[in-house]
């Protein structure tokens, strides 16, 4: 079926996957200006190789060496899948008349959503106006990217209930102590 896809990914085996798909002759890729293949397009192609979205998402996560977190919008709902090792987050927000899913918790604060929960590693859920349903239970192995707190994350964001701003403050204190300040 038709869907819209957003990804946060680091695909270490992108060249191998692309070559394998091209050899099968089942698709073609559009190149970006630098001549590279778009990672989101590759993920969509992997998903489409299976009979349904859930199998396709799991297949893409299994085949990719690296990290893949995604949001996939269909007429039936918004499918959310966190990286199998939890490297990058998916946060669910809620308010009286609905739900949202974002990659960073501060994204919906001005829209009057409140934190509902973060998906666990490898968890797949679907959001509809009626609620959030877990389709694949979360795993136990969490390896969240530490750069979220010290580099990438917006200061007002929280990951696994740890504030980016507070983490940076504490890191600064530790560096100052180490350097004798």
Model-predicted segments: where are they?
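Conserved short alpha-helical segments that host acidic/polar catalytic motifs at enzyme active sites
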Residues: 1-121, 126-181
């Amino acid at each position: 079926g038709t869907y819209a896809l957003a990804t946060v990914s680091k695909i270490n085996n992108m060249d191998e996957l692309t070559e394998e798909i091209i050899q099968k002759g089942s698709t073609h890729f559009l190149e970006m200006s630098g001549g590279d293949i778009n990672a989101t397009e590759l993920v969509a192609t992997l998903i489409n190789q299976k009979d349904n979205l859930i199998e396709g998402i799991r297949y893409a996560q299994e085949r990719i060496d690296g990290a893949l977190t995604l949001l996939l919008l269909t007429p039936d709902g918004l499918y959310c899948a966190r990286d199998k090792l939890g490297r990058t987050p998916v946060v669910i927000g809620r308010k009286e008349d609905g739900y949202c899913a974002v990659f960073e918790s501060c994204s919906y604060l001005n829209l009057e959503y409140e934190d509902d929960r973060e998906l666990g590693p490898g968890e797949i859920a679907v959001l509809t106006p009626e609620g959030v349903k877990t389709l694949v239970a979360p795993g136990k192995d969490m390896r969240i990217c530490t750069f979220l707190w010290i580099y990438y994350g917006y200061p007002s964001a929280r990951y696994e209930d740890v504030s980016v701003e507070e983490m940076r403050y504490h890191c600064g204190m530790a560096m100052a102590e180490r350097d004798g300040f």
